[in-house]
Amino acid sequence: MALPNGISSKQELLEAQAHVWNHIYSYINSMSLKCAIQLGIPDAIHKHGNPITLSQLADALNINKAKSHGLFRLMRILVHSGFFDKVKVKVKVEGEDEEEEEDAYSLTPASRLLLRSEPLSVAPFALAMSDPVYTETWHHLSEWFRNDAVAAFDTKYGMTFPEYAVADDRLNVLFNEAMACDAGFVNSILTTECREIFDGLESMVDVGGGTGATAKGIAAAFPGMECTVLDLPNVVGGLKGSENLSFVSGDMFDFIPHADAIFMKFILHDWNDEECVKILKKCKEAISRSNNSCRKIILVEIVMEDEKETHEATETKLFFDMQMLAIITGKERSEKEWGKLFFDAGFTNYKITRVLGLRSVIEVFP
């Protein structure tokens, strides 16, 4: 066998081929996961209460009996991907007194995060990010590199993602549900392990806070703090507040309500550096009228290039960064890049707390 230049052995060639094939077909992992959520596989196993056999699972999901082998193959790849465990259970043989062993499936920590009843469920996020509106954009990435569009999304749809989301009610709902489900996870940590971040604050504005899922959790945890959600009219129009929570419609590039603190979760990564500096300057204006010595900006964002993280964590951050490249004008940033933005916007100091897994809490001080 003639080996390509730079490959020294047949084994190296075969390993290289397997590596390439693995990446060619890696989208199948995402689509298999999406299928599992749409079929309700995690919920069916959870409802069963014990490890569930293939036939029991097929019955619970009302699967076409002619396609039970397809369900077996779907479960096989999902077990391999770590979403389910396969165990042996004893089942009674029909018409006999004997029992025999059969394969059965149980939940893993990953699939428990896909349960509809789980407060920290990421199922809505998974369904949104695997929606064709997002995935079809990737077929235009190479074209985008050679044209003048701001993102591959614009190349595909002829408009920016925010413009598309405003015009498409279905996508708007999907996106807001995805952001709301993530809020449960963030709130569970912010309001327990990071309570000191909110010490001394009497008012806070959640900029780009969507339907208020994050702000509601913070407002409930800190009843003495006035919380305001600022977002576009198509997002917050018609939403009603409660005791210490209110909604304001508007564009953060035009104005941000005054407060002791400005909170932004996964907002700045949507924008390029110039736009981020503009947003941060608006935030600085919003807290400048406060006499509170604790005034600051609170960000929940990814910080790239963390030498202590795992290979999988780095890869996931790179996925997020490429998503920003394809869909909008933003990016994920290193600590050095974050620091430059803060200082360019007139802030004097910042503090990064790595407490949210892939993301960090960043406090920015005037």
From Swiss-Prot:
Coiled coil, from the record: none
Single Gene Ontology BP annotation: flavonoid metabolic process
Protein origin, superkingdom: Eukaryota
Gene3D superfamilies (alphabetical): Vaccinia Virus protein VP39, Winged helix-like DNA-binding domain superfamily/Winged helix DNA-binding domain
Enzyme class: transferase
GO molecular function, one term: protein dimerization activity
Keywords: Methyltransferase, S-adenosyl-L-methionine, Transferase
Keyword Transferase: yes
Catalytic activity line of the entry: 3,3',4',5,7,8-hexahydroxyflavone + S-adenosyl-L-methionine = 3,3',4',5,7-pentahydroxy-8-methoxyflavone + S-adenosyl-L-homocysteine + H(+); 4',7,8-trihydroxyflavone + S-adenosyl-L-methionine = 4',7-dihydroxy-8-methoxyflavone + S-adenosyl-L-homocysteine + H(+); 8-hydroxy-7-methoxyflavone + S-adenosyl-L-methionine = 7,8-dimethoxyflavone + S-adenosyl-L-homocysteine + H(+)
Keyword Transferase part of the UniProt annotation: yes
The protein's role, per its UniProt record: Flavonoid 8-O-methyltransferase involved in the biosynthesis of polymethoxylated flavonoids natural products such as pebrellin, aroma compounds which contribute to the flavor of peppermint, and exhibit pharmacological activities such as anti-allergic, anti-oxidant, antibacterial, anti-proliferative, and anti-inflammatory effects. Catalyzes S-adenosylmethionine-dependent regioselective 8-O-methylation of flavonoids; active on various hydroxylated flavonoid substrates, including 7,8,3'4'-tetrahydroxy-flavone, 7,8,4'-trihydroxy-flavone and 8-hydroxy-flavone 7-methyl ether.
Membership in a protein family: Belongs to the class I-like SAM-binding methyltransferase superfamily. Cation-independent O-methyltransferase family. COMT subfamily.
Name recorded for this polypeptide: 8-hydroxyquercetin 8-O-methyltransferase
Organism: Mentha piperita (Peppermint)
